[in-house]
Amino acid sequence: FSDQTAVDGARIPTLEEVLHLIRRSGNENVRLNIETKLRPTEPELFLEPREFVSSLLKIIHQQGFSVRVTIQSFDWRTLQETQRQAPNIPTSYLTVQQDWYDNLLMGKPGPSPWTAGHDIDNYAGNVPEMVKKAGGQIWSAFHPEMTAEKVKQAHDLGLKVKVWTVNDTDRMEALIDMGVDGIITDYPDRLRGVLEKRGMPLPKQTPVSP
């Protein structure tokens, strides 16, 4: 991120502070895609999923954002727990199958520790089917792994498709052509430019300062 500007004294805001900022903007159409960060392979470093999700949902409910959030995670345990505690909140199932990170572990004995007991090999490698069976509404895949055929598979199952993390405008164009429902990017201004060029609907901008 060579073009970002450092700000002395800047710190990571709490979720509660972010929600307050959004409310101050006055734009009630702003939604949040909140990702939980747990590692089932290192349980000693994290809260137990039920406690983690309970704490997260408490803030969301207290601030009145229950209908304005989606919860996503590579650790499907937290998504299953969200579905138990707050079935009205959409869950987005993150997946990646790369040498540097693989949360599905296709072809390995037993289920991946990341997928809450679901084994991709029991679905013949069909990721959308496993996400649907797990109760997800959204499949969020690493964008190089997405194809038009996979988008159709997911849509036929009633799932929405989001991809991450797309920073190249040509790739954004290609994924839109495939029919994805959402794109996660580090550069929303680039994506906004692509959407504007294509004549697609754009959300209203509502700048607000902390």
Report each predicted region and the residues it spans.
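Metal-dependent phosphodiesterase/phospholipase catalytic core, i.e.
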Residues: F1-P90, L94-Q98, P111-Y123, K133-F142, ...
